[in-house]
């Protein structure tokens, strides 16, 4: 669970640390705005990606399933700055098929946490393999 009050306090401290006045009119709402933004950016922290993939259907064929152009936004775990990307997922079903709507949700859950791009791709692959 996100600690919004802790985030707001940290933003106030950050503003002080860079020489800004957090009580300045233009910055008064910044701590709340950052806490609100982080609640979305970090919604995947603690989430279980395999739960997203729980609903499957019998595979009538074992052809490759491909879904392209899944847009994503994540936060670099080294710099806490956003990065964007596009994921393309292809997999061979093993008697069961994942609903196509579940694949973007999987990407969203895994991207919504402090992340590195190279780890994100491995985590998506690992979740699909399980």
Residue locations for each model-derived region?
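A domain-level signal for the structural core that forms small-molecule/cofactor-binding pockets
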Residues: 1-130
């Amino acid at each position: 669970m996100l600690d919004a009050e802790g985030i707001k306090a940290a933003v106030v401290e950050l503003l002080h640390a860079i020489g800004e006045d957090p009580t300045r009119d233009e910055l008064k709402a910044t701590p709340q705005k950052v806490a609100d933004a982080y609640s979305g950016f970090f919604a995947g922290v603690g989430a279980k990606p395999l739960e997203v993939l729980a609903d499957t259907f019998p595979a009538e064929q074992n052809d490759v399933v491909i879904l392209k152009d899944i847009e994503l936004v994540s936060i670099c775990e080294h710099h806490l700055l956003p990065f964007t990307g596009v994921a393309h997922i292809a997999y061979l079903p093993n008697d069961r098929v994942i609903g196509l709507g579940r694949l973007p949700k999987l990407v969203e859950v895994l991207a919504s946490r402090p992340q590195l791009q190279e780890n994100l791709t491995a985590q998506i692959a690992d979740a699909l393999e399980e």
